[in-house]
Structure formats: structure tokens, C-alpha cells
């Protein structure tokens, strides 16, 4: 089994790459892909860059060049679930775009034309992630809706609007739904696993800078624990 692992920023993939055996690096279109072994599995780890376009490019290249059996998106996110604190983890139950609106043509808010309203992660990957939680000690993890858009959310007015549209949203970030959409197009199983770096409020920019490394490390540990369950 070969697993593709995608993170947007260096702190989100650094621990994974450092933990790999027999790493081999290839760069395509400015995106580095590191192949090797991690937790006894063949893996390819890539840092996609921030946002939906770069995430889509990286995912497509990963699938076309390496043909992974499944893809895990790891990294940080802003939290919306009251029971979660910075450093806690959200495992995707579904993934949606929060910044898409073609409702004029009868689609749901967040649904891209000719695409499903929500992208559903692979059941086996979600189950493996749930089992992996036990190995993380004090870190809390829940399963929930993760939403994606090309904006860093720290405006209370925008947060309120997003929660009106997606009242069950547990976390938001900037790559997951794009990765999920590409996986849907290629019929590749996926799961999104995010650790909270901030709480999507006025303090988010400060919290993000301070806690990104912590969130990235927690999410990476979760990915390694998940791989051990596969």
C-alpha cells in the first residue's frame, strides 16, 4: 500500500519527512515530493503550498506520478467547535468549500457546479484515524465537518456568516476541499486530518504564528499513528 501525504507548509510536513526511511526527493513545477517509508508503509510526502489552486496541482501531480492507494491531507486549521482547544485534532466526516456560491443555478451553498455538495472521506481511513487517537495521550480528537476557502478567517462577521451556512463546521482551512475534489475526480480514497492552530477569531493571526509548529507536529503524529493502523 502506498499513501500520499499532503501538507501546505513546511511545519506541517517537516516531522513526517524527518521520520522517513530511505527518502528520495523529486521536484515538479516547484513542488517537492519525498518518497520513502514511514511507519512501515510506502509514502510520498509533499508540501503543496497554501491555497486551493496549489493544493489541486500538488494532488494531481501526486496521483499521476506516484499512483497512491490513498491520500491523507494533514496540517493546521482554525477551530469552530467549542469543545476543542488549540492543538486538538479534527478528523473529517465530510469536507466542503465554504467560499463557493452557484446557488443561482440550484446548487447548495458551498457546492461547485457539477460536483457533490460534500466530499466524503474513506471509511477505512477515518476508522484508522479514530483508532490512532488513543496513542496521542492528552490530545483530543473529534470527527466533524471541515470547510475550505482561499481566506484566513479571523473576522467575527465572516465567522458568523459561515456558521449560518455551515452550522456543524468543526474547522476551516485552505486546502482540504480542493484535495478532496481532485481525489473524487480520480476516485482515490482520502481523509483530511487537521490540528487547530487558532480559533478563527480576532486573535487568530497571533495564535496561528505562535501555535503553527505545535499544530503541525500534532497533526503529523496523528498521521504516523494512522499509518500504523493500516
UniProtKB/Swiss-Prot annotation:
Superkingdom of origin organism: Bacteria
One cellular component (GO) term of this entry: cytosol
Active-site residues, record numbering mapped to chain: 12, 198
GO biological process assignments: L-methionine salvage from methylthioadenosine; L-methionine salvage from S-adenosylmethionine; nucleoside catabolic process
InterPro entries, per the entry: MTA_SAH_Nsdase, Nucleoside_phosphorylase_d, Nucleoside_phosphorylase_sf
One MF term in the entry's GO annotations: methylthioadenosine nucleosidase activity
Gene3D superfamilies: Nucleoside phosphorylase domain (3.40.50.1580)
Keyword Amino-acid biosynthesis part of the UniProt annotation: yes
Pathway stated in the Swiss-Prot or TrEMBL entry: Amino-acid biosynthesis; L-methionine biosynthesis via salvage pathway; S-methyl-5-thio-alpha-D-ribose 1-phosphate from S-methyl-5'-thioadenosine (hydrolase route): step 1/2
Broad EC category: hydrolase
One Pfam family of this chain: PNP_UDP_1
Keywords, ordered alphabetically: Amino-acid biosynthesis, Hydrolase, Methionine biosynthesis
E.C. no: 3.2.2.9
Record: residues binding substrate: 78, 153, 174-175
Catalytic function, reaction form: S-adenosyl-L-homocysteine + H2O = S-(5-deoxy-D-ribos-5-yl)-L-homocysteine + adenine; S-methyl-5'-thioadenosine + H2O = 5-(methylsulfanyl)-D-ribose + adenine; 5'-deoxyadenosine + H2O = 5-deoxy-D-ribose + adenine
Stored HAMAP family: Salvage_MtnN
Free-text function comment from the UniProt entry: Catalyzes the irreversible cleavage of the glycosidic bond in both 5'-methylthioadenosine (MTA) and S-adenosylhomocysteine (SAH/AdoHcy) to adenine and the corresponding thioribose, 5'-methylthioribose and S-ribosylhomocysteine, respectively. Also cleaves 5'-deoxyadenosine, a toxic by-product of radical S-adenosylmethionine (SAM) enzymes, into 5-deoxyribose and adenine.
Family: Belongs to the PNP/UDP phosphorylase family. MtnN subfamily.
Protein's name in the database: 5'-methylthioadenosine/S-adenosylhomocysteine nucleosidase
Organism: Shewanella sediminis (strain HAW-EB3)
Amino acid at each position: 500500500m502506498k499513501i500520499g501525504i499532503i501538507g501546505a507548509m513546511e511545519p506541517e510536513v517537516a516531522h513526517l519527512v524527518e521520520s522517513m526511511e530511505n527518502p528520495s526527493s523529486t521536484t515538479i513545477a516547484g513542488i517537492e515530493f519525498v518518497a520513502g517509508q514511514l511507519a512501515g508503509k510506502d509514502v510520498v510526502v509533499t508540501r503543496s503550498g497554501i491555497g486551493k489552486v496549489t493544493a489541486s496541482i500538488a494532488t494531481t501531480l501526486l496521483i499521476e506520478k506516484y499512483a497512491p492507494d490513498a491520500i491523507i491531507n494533514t496540517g493546521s486549521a482554525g477551530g469552530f467547535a467549542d469543545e476543542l482547544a488549540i492543538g486538538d485534532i479534527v478528523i473529517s466526516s465530510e469536507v466542503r468549500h465554504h467560499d463557493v456560491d452557484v446557488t443561482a443555478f440550484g446548487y447548495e451553498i458551498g457546492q461547485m457546479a457539477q460536483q457533490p455538495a460534500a466530499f466524503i472521506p474513506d471509511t477505512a481511513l477515518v476508522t484508522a484515524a479514530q483508532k490512532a487517537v488513543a496513542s496521542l495521550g492528552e490530545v483530543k480528537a473529534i470527527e466533524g465537518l471541515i470547510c475550505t476557502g482561499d481566506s484566513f478567517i479571523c473576522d467575527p462577521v465572516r465567522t458568523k456568516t459561515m456558521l449560518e451556512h455551515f452550522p456543524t463546521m468543526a474547522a476551516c482551512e485552505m486546502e482540504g476541499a480542493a484535495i478532496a475534489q481532485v481525489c473524487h475526480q480520480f476516485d482515490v480514497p482520502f481523509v483530511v486530518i487537521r490540528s487547530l492552530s487558532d480559533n478563527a477569531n480576532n486573535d487568530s493571526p497571533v495564535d496561528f504564528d505562535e501555535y503553527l509548529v505545535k499544530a503541525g507536529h500534532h497533526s503529523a503524529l496523528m498521521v504516523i499513528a494512522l499509518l500504523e493502523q493500516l
